[in-house]
Amino acid sequence: MSYTRIYRLVPPHLRPIYFQYAKKIKNLFVKLKIKITEKQETARRGKNNFPPNAPVIVVGIFSSPTGIGQGARLMWDKMRKDRRLVEAVDVTSALGLPGGKKLEGVLDERAFQKLQPSTIVVHLNPPEFEKLYFKFPKKLRRNSKIIAYWAWELEIMPEEWRITAKLCDEIWVPSDFVAYSAIKMLEKNYVQKITVVPHHVAKTNLSNFQLLMRKKSARARYGFNEDDFIVGYSFAFSSVFSRKNPIAVIVAFQKAFSSDNFQGKKLLLRYRDGHVWPHGIKLLENEAKKDNRIILINANESKIDMDDFYDILNVYMSLHRSEGYGITLIEAANRGVKVITTGWWLAKDIENNENVIKISWKLIDVDDPQNVYNVCGARWADPDVNDASQKLHMLYCESKLPSGNKLLPLE
């Protein structure tokens, strides 16, 4: 019986404490197992016994709507488009994580018993990474090349990740920021294992007219006026409310468009997993009650998927405090949407995108009421909402000009 089932026997008022310590104890046993088997596991390095044409195995939480899940889906899709031999394995249910729609062509964890040794790219952070690692059959994990694909959002990685790194032949990361964090954390003889492999998000090849028609169609489907100026942001409470920082988006929107300039402007806040931090839901609902231009969209219930969400928008505004990569930023920009975002440690391919507009920031100490980022000495950005509001207002003014005309540079 797993610790997630035992909780039913625990009195309700003690369950939060039970979960806190049960997870710590379980993770401690996993770390101990790594210590005990470390010599056996690392002895296989350089002895990858598989044919050079063996298919790459991409492992991840494919049915999860999270950024880590999307990273696995993007890699699998890119390899297929490049006509590489590749298999995909969804481990969402194997790890007891919430998931959604199963993807056609993706195997489940039972496939590990039949798959032959190969290059295995695992899109999971610790502690999920090592939990899955020991679910691999010994023959598979000891004769394969194991690559961890990690994402992290702070300059300092948790110290325990160093132990997990010993199980990997290589570590891939989506950005220079995550590479910087990993290099600081890892022992010197492991640093050479780190490679920056950005997510591949296809860029639209539609003309401006086709983009306009797509926007018009999306707005018609969901009841939005085609002449409205619509700003949007999408985030998950499970990705930490204070890091995603949607309140700053509200403030910047309201500064850009005061109440006497009410007509035809809307702010769509698309969120997921509100149950993770109910206090955050109350904060958003209070703001929406005071300003009916703010529309809250619960992604767990709404029929508006991410592609339609981007197509509805004039501007995607992310005033996050930190991002390991920022998949939604590049997805929006590559669909032809203007993106206003915090300029701190942007991934190069995002920073260089013609549709991305950076705003200024200052560094502050991490303050996370959800207690996810318990890393001593960590910092993140405090985005300048005045700068964001000015650039948002300028984009609005430009949207009213004849096509192709611009005001003064936004940078």
What are these regions (language model features)?
Residues 2-119, 124:
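N-terminal pre-catalytic "stem/leader" segment of glycosyltransferase-like enzymes
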Residues 43-44, 57-59, 95-183:
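Extended catalytic core of nucleotide-activated donor transferases of GT-like folds
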Residues 57-60, 225-244, 250-254:
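Conserved donor-binding/catalytic core segment of Leloir-type glycosyltransferases
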Residues 107, 207-224:
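A short helix/loop element that forms part of the nucleotide-sugar donor recognition site in Leloir-type
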Residues 278-307:
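Nucleotide-activated donor-binding/catalytic signature segment of Leloir-type glycosyltransferases, i.e.
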Residues 321:
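Aromatic "clamp/platform" in nucleotide-sugar-dependent glycosyltransferases that forms part
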Residues 338-341, 357-358:
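Short hydrophobic beta-strand element within catalytic cores of glycosyltransferases
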